[in-house]
Structures are given as C-alpha cells and as structure tokens.
Amino acid sequence: MITAGLTSDSARIRIINDWVYHNHGFGKNNQFFVVPALGPTPVQVLETGGDCGDKSRLVSAMLRELGIQSGLVMIFSCRDCMPIHTLVEARYEGGRMVVDPIWDIDYPAADGRFLGVRDLAGTSLGRDRLAQLQLQRGTADKIRWMPENEATFDFAKPLNWDKNLVTRFAAYGLSLLGYDPGQLFRPQFLEDPKLALTLALLAVAAMIVAANFVVRAISELCNKYT
C-alpha cells in the first residue's frame, strides 16, 4: 500500500495525490458505467487515467477507503461562470486541505499546516504556491502550463448551488438547518457512478412500493363502501 508507514492524514493525502498524478495520462476518460452521463468509475480511472475531474474522483475514492473524509471542489472564474477545473478538498489532522492530482500540487501554510478552500479564497496564496512550484520544478515539468485561474479559489465550491431552482432551494434549506452549503463536502454518490445508479434504482423501487400501497389502500376502501 502506498501509504504504508505514514502516520498522519496529511501525509497520506499528499502521497495519494502524487500517486494518482503519476498514474496514467491526463486526457478525458471516455469510459462510463451503464450510461455515459454517469462518467467513469474510480476503478476505470485507476486503470487508464483521466482529466482533472476523473483523477480527483479517484483521489477522493482512495481517501474514503482510508477513512479520510473528502470531496470534489469545482473552481469557477466568476460567480456566474461555468466551472473550469476540479480538485479535491480533504479533512486532515489540522482541518481541511486542498490537493490537485492533475498538477501534483498542494497548498502548505508557513506554520506547517495546509490550506483549504476557505483559507485560499480571497487571497493570492494559491497563485503564490503555483509560482513557487513552477520555479522549483523548472520548465521541463508539466506544472509550467498550469494557468493561474486554476489556483484561484475565490469562487470555488463543491456544488453549483445556483444552478437551478432545486439546488437553490436545497441550499436555502441547509442554511435554515444551520449548515453552510459552501462548507459541505460533495455527496459521495455524485462521485461514484455505481452508487448513484444504485440510489436511483432504490428510489424508483421505493416509489413503486409506495404507489402499490396507495393503490391497494384505495381499492380496499372502495370495496368496503360498495
């Protein structure tokens, strides 16, 4: 196991991010589970690689296997823009930290901690870290091509809560319950096609059972009064 001998979650998170970065290529993984809309499974990404969303999905899945809470985060250039990049935010012993498996980058703080999305938003710390690594690794490294906006976290979030009426209503409901939607980890079923399909089928089955129960109840009620 690539995390053998590591004693902290931050070390495990960093080594998994680095391993996924070096595992196969960076092109979009066109495999999928059952239907194309579900995208590739973490195992399919493990076998053939993938782009930022694909590799981030694999990192998050591997972290969950270690019991480390994590989720995908999307980066937006502006509040109403489309997402331009995907990476991972994970919980470690000091809070939350961001790792990016498409560029092999994390964001350490000067005091030995690591930075999460909330720490990076509204600052130049992400871009400063990028410039530092570009200088350290030299022109032969892939990171020289990383654009600054992929290290800018001002509008980063796990879900686009403004996408439609349903997501806005969900965000409002979470706020009423005392949760900050922007600080919630992305639900696992959005990252695992098999789990998403399983939950969808269970929901359909539950609706069928409920509908059957209602029909039978109405039928018995009608028979009682006829």
Segments predicted by a language model, with ranges:
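Short, charged juxtamembrane terminal tails flanking transmembrane helices
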Residues: 220-226
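Hydrophobic/aromatic-rich core segments of domains that either
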Residues: 57-132
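Soluble catalytic regions of membrane-associated enzymes that act on cell-envelope
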Residues: 53
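Linear, non-domain "peripheral" regions
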Residues: 1-3, 193, 221
